[in-house]
A protein has these predicted regions:
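N-terminal propeptides/leader regions of secreted preproproteins
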Residues: 1-32, 36
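Loop/turn elements at helix/coil->beta-strand transitions in domains of secreted/extracellular proteins
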Residues: 61-66, 99, 133-136, 156-157
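Short, surface-exposed glycine/acidic/tryptophan-bearing loops
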Residues: 74-115, 128-130
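Secreted/periplasmic proteins
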Residues: 45, 51-54, 99-108, 114, ...
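A short alpha-helix/helix-coil micro-patch that ends at or immediately precedes a cysteine
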Residues: 24-87
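Disulfide-stabilized extracellular recognition modules
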Residues: 111-164
């Protein structure tokens, strides 16, 4: 147990630089916490990704734009990117980048929260409301931290890619 609530953990992680977060997550994952008994696992939350897709198209409709179509070819790329940002929270992709635009986020615990945050950021909003892109894919990768006392914490990693 790191001695903090989920909200405190999210706030702490959001305040870190990418290097600080990488060091912290590595220390947790490899057992250098005080109890040396942390298990880290992860999974893709496809329901959350679908909800982001739906909310994105709702924002587009609210702004008089046509809906994005889902790009199933790019979905595996978005999944890979969501897992990559666990270690390197940046727009630098190991395998290159074939999207027109990319939104990333970390820590938001719901689809509505992440879309709201993106809509309140000029660059992310521009991607969502682009008149160049016609397709998108979304991934939500969730890290689950299980501690010796049985308590758990979750950290959400979000990626939305755009193309035409």
């Amino acid at each position: 147990n790191l001695g903090m609530t989920d909200d405190e953990m999210v706030a702490m992680l959001q305040s870190m630089t990418p290097d600080e977060m990488d060091a912290f997550l590595n220390s947790v994952a490899y057992g250098s916490t005080t109890d040396n008994n942390v298990q880290v696992s992860g999974y893709y939350d496809n329901n959350m990704a679908q909800e982001v897709f739906n909310l994105t198209n709702q924002e587009r409709a609210n702004n008089g734009l046509s809906a994005y179509s889902w790009d199933s070819n790019m979905a595996s790329y978005s999944d890979r990117r969501a897992k990559e940002i666990v270690k390197d929270y940046s727009h630098n992709s190991v395998g290159g980048n074939w999207s027109v635009g990319e939104n990333i986020a970390e820590g938001e615990t719901s689809a509505s929260e992440v879309v709201n945050d993106w809509m309140n950021s000029a660059g992310h909003k521009a991607n969502i409301l682009s008149d160049v892109s016609t397709k998108t894919s979304v991934s939500c990768y969730v890290e689950k931290f299980t501690y010796a006392d049985g308590s758990t914490q979750y950290l959400y990693h979000w990626v939305q890619n755009f193309t035409h």
